[in-house]
């Protein structure tokens, strides 16, 4: 392998590594955003003045109409 080929391989390898590092950082930022959104939702739930009700059952709601 010539010196020129080694230099080209090194350059391409550096480009690949840089691209993968950028992708990894983007994923970390996305995970951070999701975690922050979850934390915000959790804090909103903690300050609600009433507990959330259980989901309504269709039959319980419409039973009088049967």
Curated annotation (Swiss-Prot):
Q: List the membrane topology term(s).
A: Peripheral membrane protein
The protein's matches in InterPro entries, at most eight in alphabetical order, are given as: Clusterin-like
List GO BP terms, alphabetically. Answer: immune complex clearance; negative regulation of amyloid fibril formation; positive regulation of apoptotic process; positive regulation of receptor-mediated endocytosis; protein stabilization; regulation of cell population proliferation
User: Which is a Gene Ontology cellular component entry for this protein?
Assistant: perinuclear endoplasmic reticulum lumen
Location of this chain's protein in the cell: Secreted; Nucleus; Cytoplasm; Mitochondrion membrane
Question: What are the GO MF terms of this UniProt record?
Answer: unfolded protein binding
Q: Which domain of life is it from?
A: Eukaryota
Q: How is it modified after translation?
A: Proteolytically cleaved on its way through the secretory system, probably within the Golgi lumen. Proteolytic cleavage is not necessary for its chaperone activity. All non-secreted forms are not proteolytically cleaved. Chaperone activity of uncleaved forms is dependent on a non-reducing environment. Polyubiquitinated, leading to proteasomal degradation. Under cellular stress, the intracellular level of cleaved form is reduced due to proteasomal degradation.
- Kindly state which keywords UniProt assigns to this record, in alphabetical order: Chaperone, Cytoplasm, Cytoplasmic vesicle, Disulfide bond, Endoplasmic reticulum, Glycoprotein, Membrane, Microsome, Mitochondrion, Nucleus, Secreted, Ubl conjugation
Family, as annotated: Belongs to the clusterin family.
**Function of the molecule:** Functions as extracellular chaperone that prevents aggregation of non native proteins. Prevents stress-induced aggregation of blood plasma proteins. Inhibits formation of amyloid fibrils by APP, APOC2, B2M, CALCA, CSN3, SNCA and aggregation-prone LYZ variants (in vitro). Does not require ATP. Maintains partially unfolded proteins in a state appropriate for subsequent refolding by other chaperones, such as HSPA8/HSC70. Does not refold proteins by itself.
This protein's assembly is summarised as: Antiparallel disulfide-linked heterodimer of an alpha chain and a beta chain. Self-associates and forms higher oligomers. Interacts with a broad range of misfolded proteins, including APP, APOC2 and LYZ. Slightly acidic pH promotes interaction with misfolded proteins. Forms high-molecular weight oligomers upon interaction with misfolded proteins. Interacts with APOA1, LRP2, CLUAP1 and PON1. Interacts with the complement membrane attack complex. Interacts (via alpha chain) with XRCC6.
| Name by which UniProt lists this protein | Clusterin
Q: Which organism is it from?
A: Ovis aries (Sheep)
Q: Which gene encodes it?
A: CLU
């Amino acid at each position: 392998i010539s010196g020129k080929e080694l230099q080209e391989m090194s350059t391409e390898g550096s480009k690949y590594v840089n691209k993968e590092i950028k992708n990894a950082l983007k994923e970390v930022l996305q995970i951070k955003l999701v975690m922050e959104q979850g934390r915000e939702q959790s804090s909103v739930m903690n300050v609600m003045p009433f507990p959330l009700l259980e989901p309504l059952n269709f039959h319980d709601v419409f039973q009088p109409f049967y």
